[in-house]
Design a protein with these regions (language model features):
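ABC-family P-loop ATPase nucleotide-binding domain
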Residues: 1-16, 225-234
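ABC family nucleotide-binding domain
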Residues: 8-220
């Protein structure tokens, strides 16, 4: 898929972030377009996860700006920022982070209920979404009863139930075998085509980076190069 040339869905402008005296992000700027998959690669400690946390409003930058759909996130209060995040951003992590006491259907429904939907409506939407992801026979299963690939598909369903525009994925295939990894990557591509989702994927894995339209190499908190996804320096 060619990279869209329309107005960026998201802009990251000159982001800095430090922890104590340790500077983690140093002047990061990037753009994400609608329907684009952007891979972020680099050595451990380069700042990749911190960058995702800042973009996703899970952490605040020391300096700089994140703009999504024309909205400056720094201008939003804490509650409004959380509501904006729930509407516009989904998260997928290497560790699925599903709640063990709840079924797959309940895990997926929870973000919809947090966003104001009734339990009945949220559960119906969760059920439909899980069926679309070939998990219709796993609705009442708890995480301990699911395979690694199934858990990640549940995590993806949870990430997209509120119809976000952007999915931030931190090493989403890191704990999967080669078959389950390929299934998850094909799911990302299908969701991009069917839902128009945009993805930012942090990865150390070449096959994961290869599905991206672009890859950015992060080194010591700076973007040092940009390539096509299939040219990522991994």
């Amino acid at each position: 898929m060619s990279i869209p040339t329309d107005t960026p869905l998201m802009e990251v402008r000159d982001i800095y972030k430090s922890f104590g005296r340790l500077e983690i992000l140093r002047g990061i700027s990037l753009e994400l377009h609608r329907g684009e998959i952007l891979a972020i690669v680099g050595a451990s400690g380069a700042g990749k996860t911190t960058l995702l946390q800042v973009i996703g409003t899970l952490d605040a930058p020391d300096r700089g700006e994140v703009i999504i759909g024309g909205e400056r996130l720094s201008a939003l209060s804490g509650d409004r920022r959380a509501a904006f995040r729930n509407r516009h951003i989904g998260f997928v992590f290497q560790s699925h982070q599903l709640m063990p006491e709840f079924t797959a259907e309940e895990n997926v429904a929870i973000p919809a209920m947090i966003s104001g939907k009734s339990r009945r409506e949220a559960m119906a939407e969760a059920s439909e979404l899980l069926r679309r992801l070939s998990l219709g026979d796993r609705l009442d299963h708890r995480p301990a009863e699911l395979s690694g690939g199934e858990k990640q598909r549940v995590a993806v369903a949870r990430a997209i139930i509120n119809h976000p525009e952007i999915v931030l994925a931190d090493e989403p295939t890191g704990a999967l075998d080669s078959v389950r990894k390929r299934e998850l990557l094909e799911l990302f591509l299908r969701l991009r085509e069917e839902e128009g989702l945009s993805f930012i994927v942090v990865t150390h894995d070449r096959e994961t980076a290869e599905i991206a339209d672009r890859s950015l190499l992060l080194s010591y908190g700076r973007i040092v190069s940009e390539q096509r996804g299939d040219e990522a320096p991994i």
